């Protein structure tokens, strides 16, 4: 698993770089959000498959699917006009929910070394949806929550993923916390 972390980081950085709009127009931001979310979904499924972790790939697919179904259901239940007025499917952001589901799945299965850059790309997707006039910040925040919950609730840690813990300690004179991680 460790041998595929570097290519994963390269893929995430490439996704982020490619999704940065060359022109700060609503269409440029929309294109950037598409590239970001589809790249994240591909990495969240492809990275486990590259490491022969079919369970991890399946968990990523189910996480993204669950987030997408919930977001779509809410769009139909609570129609809200988009900032650009194009339709009434603003709430919540489906792009953001899918991006955060993929990022949470990567973080849970691969560890923080892959998860943190994945969440950075997911955050960029949310920003791009707002800048592209497709969503309000509230739509993006709810989408991020849906995706994160789906990813973290459905995905299980890989046995080789870096693990960390926060331990409380104390005695009669002092108290504190100890953070431990395995490299």
Descriptions of predicted regions:
Residues 40-47:
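Hydrophobic core of alpha-helical transmembrane segments in multi-pass integral membrane proteins
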Residues 47-66:
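Interfacial segments of alpha-helical transmembrane regions
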């Amino acid at each position: 698993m460790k041998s595929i972390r570097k290519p994963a980081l390269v893929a995430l950085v490439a996704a982020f770089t490619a999704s940065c709009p060359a022109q700060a127009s609503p269409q440029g931001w929309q294109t950037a959000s598409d590239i970001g979310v589809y790249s994240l979904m591909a990495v969240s499924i492809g990275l486990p498959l590259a490491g022969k972790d079919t369970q991890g790939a399946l968990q990523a697919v189910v996480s993204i699917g669950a987030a997408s179904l919930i977001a779509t259901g809410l769009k139909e239940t609570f129609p809200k006009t988009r900032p650009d007025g194009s339709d009434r499917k603003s709430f919540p952001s489906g792009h953001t929910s899918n991006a955060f589901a993929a990022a949470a799945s990567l973080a849970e299965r691969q560890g923080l070394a892959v998860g943190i850059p994945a969440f950075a790309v997911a955050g960029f997707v949310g920003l791009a949806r707002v800048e592209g006039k497709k969503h309000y910040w509230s739509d993006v925040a709810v989408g991020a929550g849906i995706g994160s919950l789906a990813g973290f609730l459905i995905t299980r840690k890989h046995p080789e993923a870096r693990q960390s813990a926060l331990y409380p300690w104390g005695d009669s004179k002092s108290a504190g916390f100890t953070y431990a991680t395995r490299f």
